[in-house]
Amino acid sequence: IEMGRTAWTTLLVLAPAATVGLPAQRNRDRVFGLSQEEWCREARRSDVCEVREETVSNTRMVDVDARGNGGVHIRGWDRPDVHVRARVVVYADSDTEAKQIASEIKLVTTGGRIRVDGPSRDRNWWRDRGWSASFELEVPRNSELMVGATNGGVIVRDVRGRMDLRTVNGGLTLDDVSGDIRGETTNGGVDIRMTGDKWEGPSLEVRTVNGGITLALPPNLSAELEARAVNGGIHVRYPVTVRGLISSRRELRGTIGNGGPRIRASATNGGISITRR
């Protein structure tokens, strides 16, 4: 294909991509539903570790605020309520102080807004002590999700609905999802695995600043694809009909199958890999 000309072609392979970020792979390996003992064993440092549980009823919107230090793992189920587990980890100068801090930490689930409240965590407070909370949720499969995290990954599996998923330091993993989805991470990879012949919903848009993106697509998918890797290549092992101006190996616009909902993927410092699931 002559660069800079308008063209239609089906691509199977493009430029090699930069390494897709490891945080997304670690996300995928994360096991859901560990016992308290097993889950607490994963904590790097803890003087006190507890798992708190609550059930939330009559809510379709699930809003998880994990903007302390902890990740969020969500999976769909067939029940109408939301089951919440929060792993609370505390460290301090003494066991007595750690237990006191743990007693002040509360799991809040009011009106579908889920968070953990606890002692102030300013710079002086953090000097010799600290606490964090990670979440696991089972939600109805048609839930609307809003998730915010700072230091931790976000995983969503088997949910179909509107989603806004954001983290700063952590990977983003989506498996068997659909709907109207926006996902973003600053420092972490993005790993998406789709099922079905078409995306059930308006669009999917994901982006990362420092990390790569992997899209694993089912064989008979129909969608419109836009991919952009600013400082990395795009590696395609999937039939894509490319249209329009072909001027860069770092940008791709095309049609998969018969076309349909739009899939957008953007990486600033990292590559994009598009493969068959």
Segment roles from a protein language model:
Residues 2-277:
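Intrinsically disordered, low-complexity terminal regions
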